[in-house]
Regions:
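Short, polar loop/linker segments at the starts of domains and inter-domain junctions
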Residues: 54, 121, 156-164
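Glycan-recognition surfaces
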Residues: 1-54, 75-83
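C-terminal beta-strand-rich structural cap/linker in extracellular carbohydrate-active enzymes
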Residues: 158-197, 218-220, 229-245
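Flexible loop/turn segments at secondary-structure boundaries
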Residues: 21, 44-45, 51-55, 77, ...
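Carbohydrate-binding surface patches
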Residues: 36-39, 44, 82-143, 173-180, ...
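Aromatic- and carboxylate-lined catalytic core of secreted/periplasmic carbohydrate-active enzymes
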Residues: 33-40, 45-46, 50-79, 169-188
């Protein structure tokens, strides 16, 4: 968490470096991998190549090994800035702007006390408005927002707030995606920074054109004639695609 705090101070001028991690770490390998993704910094592994865990590495990169990066480095959410997440008894939250107007957010339980083995975390619609802190005029209070749980692959419109439990030393990754003209572009599911895996070329009430930057399962939220659908589209090669409602 010190790296996130340092970024709040130094990230105004430089991209951070969250240091190395072991992909084979059975306690926090996946947690550290996701923190590297949202940090926007370099990624380097310290385990021996024979010990690499591809499930923790491939979600960071495309087929050529290029990192998917946020538009700005992740920093703590306001309520987490002046806390020590090891002893606070509360969830620790960080966020970064990702592609297509989305904001990626990670909620952690880093508490070391057995009394706080389980903590409650909450994501509010107003959290998305903080994207303005990274990029001017990117979000408004009237913007509709989709909350996407990366692990469960479930999506819902975030009309007010969503509450959930963090049990043990763990994290949960979410994407807050704007719903515009009945579309919300989530991106390729297999990558941690899903919104950074696609580029929106054009968007109308009935048609969406995207440039998909890697292979995998493209997730798009579609609203049409009063119905809502989380559509999954298989992408076997990076390409431009057109989606009709």
């Amino acid at each position: 968490f010190q790296s996130y705090t340092n970024t709040l101070l130094l990230g105004q001028t430089v991209w951070p470096d969250h240091d190395m991690f072991h992909s084979c770490d059975t306690v926090c390998g996946t947690l550290m991998a996701r923190s590297k993704a949202i940090s926007g910094g370099p990624v380097y592994l310290s385990d021996a190549p024979r010990d690499f865990i591809k499930e923790n590495i491939f979600p960071l990169i495309d087929e050529q090994g290029k990192l998917f990066r946020p538009e700005a480095p992740a920093v703590p959410m306001p309520e987490s800035i002046l806390t020590n997440p090891l002893w606070s008894g509360k969830a620790y939250r960080v966020a970064a702007p990702s592609g297509n107007g989305a904001m990626t957010l990670i909620c952690y339980n880093l508490n070391v006390s057995p009394r706080h083995q389980q903590v409650q975390a909450i994501i509010k619609k107003e959290d998305y408005s903080l994207r303005n802190s990274f990029e001017k005029m990117s979000a408004t209070s009237e913007e509709r927002v989709l909350l996407y749980n990366w692990e469960s692959q479930k999506a819902e419109e975030l009309s007010d707030s969503s509450t959930f439990e963090l049990i043990g030393f763990t994290d949960k990754l979410f994407h807050l995606c704007p719903i515009r003209k009945g579309w919300a572009v989530i991106g390729v599911q297999e990558k941690y920074l899903s919104p950074s895996t696609v580029q929106t070329i054009s968007l109308t009430e009935n048609r969406l054109e995207l440039n998909v930057l890697c292979t995998g399962t493209l997730k798009v939220w579609i609203e049409n004639s009063g119905k809502q659908e989380l559509r999954s589209i298989s992408i076997d090669t990076p390409q431009k695609i057109v989606i009709e409602k």
